[in-house]
């Protein structure tokens, strides 16, 4: 046995021993000890496979370094190089982002399987014999689903049909799954245009290891599998080709030359795409390879080509990267991702930037170039996995500290992170000082890290909290003179208007001592109804109604039908285009979803006499940091706070019992859910409609019980007339949701519900008739590219518009034509503020870790009458036992009081 083989097998023995000790709850493979063993294992294998000397010494450090450079140039060993790169990074860096641990474990398992297969087939060397004990999550339903898909991938069905589709696609996610220790992939993708909706996704399956960095073209065929009594159509990828959009290469070239000159119909482009496809090498790796390898690849690609402009640009870029000049981190990320909409946001179209190597890059990119792990590009927040793949982490440790604190604040609503929670970092004071010194001078006040007592925080977040609270306190110093008597007269004149004593008392006291009112209440307690009463009370005054989402705004518009009212989303109000800011009263609904930054901007921009803030701290929170609504009542007088308790949404006492127990995390949550029949096994009844007003809610888009598959199941059972548009199928009577494409905005807004009522095809277009969940008149539709053709039986408007069959993904102005998505099922987040007679919620073990208390409570309270929660008994126990309320409000409020003398 050679020395290198012995080294490999010795490392293998240690790894197998560790694998045998792991279980599902122990992510022990992420420990530094195991990472060190894995690194040695991979490096020994690289030395064996890349050396021409069979007696290579495994302990020769210089030879190891040399051979690892060779590894980077070996297309057949790309997986080994990527695994080594992954192991070079600290696992703690990867786990800074949500669900990163699970993704990391899947990556390890995938790479280890590839190593075992490769060494067995190529070297007749048997390693990792107990790989089946590796701790990845498994589920019987998912196993059956994956086995059926794998069978279709491995055995081409005679009934399958190839899809004639040649458009470019963006890969959103590739998730491996494993059947009989063979690797397959679930690939989620969208059309490659600049405005494609992130919700308009398609899933396909393959055994091919596809590079996910760039736009691609797929050869796809359809097949069918059976899940229970249901047939499901699946897409299978037979082959793939990298196909970077020419506009992306043009815009990348513009960064260096200030002009665009790349075409997709030239030899260099074709050869480069073939090289990327065959070797799965991304452009960043190519441009950072050793000189001899780069030059040899370049020579092959540009051979016989008349136009070599692309490689002239690459040569300039390569020099910047090799010398780590200003702008190199921006270029690294752009080379790694090549996404047109991201790239365009970074370009300075009217000149160059001296501070960024005189490239055509905006000065606003500079913070990212200097601190890529703690700041964002213009209009884009990179994922931690992508950053770690393309930018070295050396000399960036202070950024990971800042990222940890920011993530803890935004994800967990912890404004002040305890120093004891930062044990993974050493020399914290030095890191804080280093981070603050690196900040751009205009960002020092807002983004700097501060210490107070035993906590560390980001200055801007604490300052925003303080300013919001101070404004609220100012509004509580005095009330409206004569207010209570004014309300009493109105109540006397409208004796049957209010049938809830709590609302009546709230109305009588609301502005007697304050100019701001906080209205808290669980789902269905009539918060919107109270808004209506207050609005009618002040019918003569000018009023502004704000909410974060279009459905919430439209709900207010339907609820409040009096004069002197404006309705808009928070984003629209804060837009520079909006100049109307003065109102007598401002109402903000679903306040818990509003981040502190936006709340502060509203208070700065809006001029008002009375402010009414309405919401529920137990429902879905702000995507960005937003704790103002939960901590405000700890600072303001009780006379400004009103809690609604009586539930009116449902008359079902059992349902209200479950809502209450979940809201308050009481004992007996599970018993009530099971006893009242709300808990269901994952079975075919998911797809059987029980009520005309019914919705299926999912947390994720992918997987067996994700939105995409549920939509596919239910659409398959729709016998309506159909049309195929690229990779999508649309049928008459499909429910739809309009997306954020802005094609018909603002009149047809994001999340507006609709139903396809007719479809017609011409040679060049598809014409859709859509019934929309609102009523328009002809004046509303002027200047829009759709036609108002009538009304449905229930009065809703029906509109008609066409889409071009031909999709162009080459150009900068390529836009997705279809402005809606199929919506038999929707995400729980999209359902906030909506209610249905019947609600089905699907929770598989794939998503159980992402089910928070707020998300679960929001989901179950969408139901008026019937509720069905589909999950396995094991998942039910784990979800309910892991529900926690975020309890940082009192601690954060206490520190704020001391820090700002509030």
Predicted regions mapped to residue ranges:
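Extended low-complexity, intrinsically disordered and solenoidal helical-scaffold regions
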Residues: 2-218
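ASCE P-loop NTPase helicase motor core
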Residues: 509-512, 516-674
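N-terminal accessory nucleic-acid engagement/regulatory domains that precede
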Residues: 117, 123-126, 130-136, 141, ...
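Conserved adenine-nucleotide phosphate-binding loops and their immediately adjacent elements
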Residues: 482-495
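Conserved, well-folded catalytic cores of nucleic-acid-processing
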Residues: 471-478, 537, 559-562, 605, ...
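Pre-Walker A adenine-sensing motif
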Residues: 495-513
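Helicase P-loop NTPase motor core
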Residues: 662-706
């Amino acid at each position: 046995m050679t020395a290198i083989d012995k080294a490999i097998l010795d490392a293998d023995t240690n790894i197998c021993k560790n694998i045998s000790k792991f279980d599902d709850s122990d992510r022990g493979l992420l420990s530094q000890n195991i990472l060190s063993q894995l690194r040695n294992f991979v490096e020994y294998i690289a030395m064996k496979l890349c050396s021409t000397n069979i007696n290579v010494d495994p302990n020769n450090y210089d030879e190891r370094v040399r051979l690892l450079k060779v590894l980077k140039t070996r297309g057949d060993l790309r997986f080994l190089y990527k695994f080594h790169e992954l192991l070079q990074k600290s696992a703690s860096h990867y786990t800074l982002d949500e669900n990163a641990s699970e993704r990391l474990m899947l990556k390890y398992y995938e790479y280890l399987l590839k190593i075992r297969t490769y060494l067995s087939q190529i070297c007749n060397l048997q390693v990792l014999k107990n790989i089946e004990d590796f701790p990845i999550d498994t589920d019987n339903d998912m196993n059956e689903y994956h086995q059926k898909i794998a069978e279709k991938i491995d055995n081409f069905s005679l009934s399958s049909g190839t899809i004639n589709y040649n458009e470019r696609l963006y890969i959103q996610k590739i998730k491996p799954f494993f059947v009989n220790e063979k690797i397959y992939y679930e690939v989620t993708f969208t059309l490659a245009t600049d405005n494609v909706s992130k919700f308009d996704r398609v899933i396909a399956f393959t055994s091919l290891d596809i590079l996910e960095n760039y736009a691609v073209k797929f050869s796809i065929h359809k097949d069918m599998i059976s899940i229970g009594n249901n047939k499901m159509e699946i897409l299978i990828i037979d082959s793939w080709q990298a196909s970077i959009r020419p506009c992306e290469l043009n815009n990348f070239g513009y960064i260096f030359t200030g002009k665009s000159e790349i075409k997709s119909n030239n030899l260099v482009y074709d050869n480069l795409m073939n090289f990327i496809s065959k070797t799965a090498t991304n452009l960043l790796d190519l441009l950072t390879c050793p000189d001899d390898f780069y030059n040899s690849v370049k020579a092959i690609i540009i051979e016989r080509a008349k136009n070599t402009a692309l490689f002239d640009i690459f040569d300039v870029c390569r020099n910047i990267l090799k010398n780590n000049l200003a702008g190199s981190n921006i270029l690294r990320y752009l080379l790694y991702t090549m996404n047109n909409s991201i790239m365009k946001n970074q370009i300075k179209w009217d000149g160059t930037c001296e501070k960024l190597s005189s490239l055509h890059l905006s000065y606003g990119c500079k913070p990212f170039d200097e601190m890529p792990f703690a700041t964002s590009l213009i209009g884009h927040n990179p994922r931690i996995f992508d950053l770690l793949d393309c930018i070295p982490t050396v000399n960036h440790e202070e950024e990971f500290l800042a990222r940890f604190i920011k993530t803890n604040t935004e994800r967990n609503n912890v404004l002040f992170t305890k120093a004891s929670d930062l044990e993974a970092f050493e020399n914290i004071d030095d890191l804080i000082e280093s981070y603050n010194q690196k900040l751009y001078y205009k960002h020092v006040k807002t983004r700097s890290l501060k210490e107070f007592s035993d906590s560390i925080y980001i200055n801007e977040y604490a300052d925003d909290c303080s300013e919001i609270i101070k404004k609220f306190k100012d509004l509580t110093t005095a009330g409206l003179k004569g207010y209570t008597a004014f309300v009493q007269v109105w109540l006397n004149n409208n004796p049957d208007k209010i049938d809830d004593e709590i609302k009546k008392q709230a109305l009588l006291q609301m502005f007697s001592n304050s100019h701001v009112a906080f209205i808290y209440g669980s789902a269905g307690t009539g918060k919107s109804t109270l808004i209506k009463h207050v609005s009618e009370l002040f019918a003569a005054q000018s009023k502004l109604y704000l909410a974060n989402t279009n459905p919430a705004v439209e709900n207010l518009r339907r609820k409040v039908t009096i004069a002197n009212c404006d309705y808009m989303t928070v984003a629209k109000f804060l837009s520079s285009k909006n100049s109307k800011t003065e109102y007598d009263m401002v109402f903000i609904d679903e306040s818990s979803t509003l981040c502190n930054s936006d709340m502060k901007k509203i208070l700065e921009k809006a001029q008002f006499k009375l402010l009414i803030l309405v919401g529920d701290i137990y429902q879905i929170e702000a995507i960005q940091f937003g704790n103002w609504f939960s901590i405000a009542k700890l600072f303001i007088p009780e006379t400004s706070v009103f809690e609604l308790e009586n539930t009116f949404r449902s008359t079902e006492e059992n349902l209200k019992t479950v809502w209450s127990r979940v809201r308050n995390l009481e004992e007996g949550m599970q018993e009530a859910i099971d006893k009242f029949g709300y808990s269901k096994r994952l079975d075919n009844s998911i797809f059987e409609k029980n009520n005309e007003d019914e919705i299926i809610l999912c947390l994720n888009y992918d997987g067996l019980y994700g939105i995409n598959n549920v939509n596919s199941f239910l659409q398959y059972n729709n016998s309506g007339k159909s049309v195929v548009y690229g990779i999508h199928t649309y049928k008459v009577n499909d429910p739809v949701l309009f997306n954020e494409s802005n094609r018909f905005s603002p009149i047809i807004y994001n999340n507006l519900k609709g139903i396809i009522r007719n479809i017609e095809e011409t040679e060049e277009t598809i014409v859709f008739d859509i019934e929309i969940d609102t009523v328009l008149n002809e004046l509303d539709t002027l200047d829009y590219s759709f036609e108002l053709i009538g009304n449905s039986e229930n009065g809703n408007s029906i509109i008609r518009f066409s889409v071009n069959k031909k999709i162009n993904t080459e150009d900068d102005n390529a836009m997705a034509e279809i402005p809606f998505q199929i919506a038999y099922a929707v995400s729980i987040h999209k359902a906030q503020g909506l209610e249905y007679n019947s609600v089905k919620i699907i929770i598989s073990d794939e998503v159980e870790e992402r089910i928070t208390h707020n998300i679960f409570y929001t989901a179950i309270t969408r139901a008026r009458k019937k509720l069905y929660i589909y999950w396995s008994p094991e998942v039910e126990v784990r979800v309910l036992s892991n529900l926690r309320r975020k309890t940082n409000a009192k601690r954060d409020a206490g520190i704020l009081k001391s820090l700002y003398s509030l």
